[in-house]
Amino acid sequence: MTPARVLAVASEVYPIVKTGGLADVAGALPIALKAHGVEMRTLMPGYPDVMRLLSGAEEIRRWPDYFGGPGRLLAGAHDGLDLFVLDVPHLYARPGNPYVTTEGVDWPDNGVRFAALSRVAADIGHGLVPAFVPDIVHAHDWQAGLAPAYLHYDNRPRPGTVMTIHNMAYQGKFAPELIGAIGLPWSSFDVNGLEYFGGISFLKAGLQFADRITTVSPTYAREIQSDEGGMGLGGLLRARAGALSGILNGIDIAVWNPQTDSHIAYRFGAEDLTFRAANKAVLQQQFNLDSSDEAPLLGVISRLSWQKGLDLLLEAIPTILGEGMQLALLGSGDRDLQDRYQAAARANPGRIGVVIGYDEILAHLIQAGSDALIVPSRFEPCGLTQLCALRYGAVPIVSRVGGLEDTIVDIGEAGREATGFKFGPVTADALAGTLRKANTAFHDKLTWRQLQRNGLATDVSWRSRAGDYAALYRSLIESRRA
């Protein structure tokens, strides 16, 4: 096995900084790749939380003026991850999350902030750190999308490049005037460069210039080549279809392990699901639901948004109530959806419970105690909650899109091999019909237990997924040597 060195570039990395699924991937993949002979180091910005955790990091480069202020490149490690940190206080030492202010407004200089990250990634690719010269630079999402562009326009020997799309909806769009401020040539403002409907797009830059493009499920890789799914970039992705592949995400099975999970009331394993009923009782109590073994308890852990289909679930509430089901929802997002769910809970005490926000303990308890987990997304690049549900014996009810299509086996298609229920088209009526079907199956205890056991037997770890990435890296390295 030929060793490979890969520099990953990500704006967030779990367990250091997390706002979404990107962080989970960036935190889990490097560790899983070690078994495949891949040495991965991850470059991330020096946000306040990062600097606190890596207070003993080694300084390996200092700049008196890096994109408008002093900066340093640090090397350190945390929780099994080997890290490079770009410490540029005037860009990253701020309150709020990595992308927005405490009021939820995008930082006005986000273009410069993440161009700086990509610039140093390209420099590491060129040998800035002699002890680690990567074979490949792997950029994650728009925040790292300029790394392949810088490497292209530097016009010198370079490593291979991979661009991963975690969500096409986030494209890093800015005014063209930014080009002059971030050190790219004006020739890059071209339809075959960064130009995007009169502005520039960091995501487009990555898709245009990366040697290989991946996204987080095979179905999503097909969907984003359409005009609708590509959200303005479908034509480019069709043109680059030969470089595009879909590799499913996994989950950290050490964190999501019902046998050792300290967040749940009663631990259990695949061979004995008895304690799931005890967790269900605790979950009902936490969400002020009626205590009942016979009422199917539906769980939801989601951002409340149009993309996630949470408006469709609201329309299906009469079906939930009519079928004698319960609903426990944990999430936040669109203010109107929050208000409507809270109103539904007030109108149906004991049947619908809602907690606005995110709570890690409650998220684990929902997986361990709900009978089914609903993921009704209009589009879903991969999805992680349904993978956790399989791991915990909560039967997924999902829409037929993206990674949901790829990770759940529908009861109507596979019988005894099934792991859940899928519905399409993505409408409230289709969801309601599938909820009725799930309710019927729930009351057939043998059928339901088979669904749970099939889910628990499904490999949702990063083990096989990491092998796919390792094969991609080696294929790219070999093609560049040829």
Swiss-Prot record:
Keyword Glycoprotein: no
Protein's UniProt keywords contain Phosphoprotein: no
Cellular component annotations (GO), alphabetically ordered: cytosol
EC number: 2.4.1.21
Keyword tags: Glycogen biosynthesis, Glycosyltransferase, Transferase
Pathway the protein takes part in: Glycan biosynthesis; glycogen biosynthesis
InterPro entries: Glyco_trans_1, GS/SS, Starch_synth_cat_dom
GO molecular function: alpha-1,4-glucan glucosyltransferase (ADP-glucose donor) activity; alpha-1,4-glucan glucosyltransferase (UDP-glucose donor) activity
GO BP terms, alphabetized: glycogen biosynthetic process
Sequence positions that bind ADP-alpha-D-glucose: 18
Catalytic activity: [(1->4)-alpha-D-glucosyl](n) + ADP-alpha-D-glucose = [(1->4)-alpha-D-glucosyl](n+1) + ADP + H(+)
Disulfide bond positions: none
Enzyme class: transferase
Family matches, as Gene3D superfamilies: Glycogen Phosphorylase B
Its job: Synthesizes alpha-1,4-glucan chains using ADP-glucose.
Family: Belongs to the glycosyltransferase 1 family. Bacterial/plant glycogen synthase subfamily.
Protein name: Glycogen synthase 2
Organism annotation: Bradyrhizobium diazoefficiens (strain JCM 10833 / BCRC 13528 / IAM 13628 / NBRC 14792 / USDA 110)
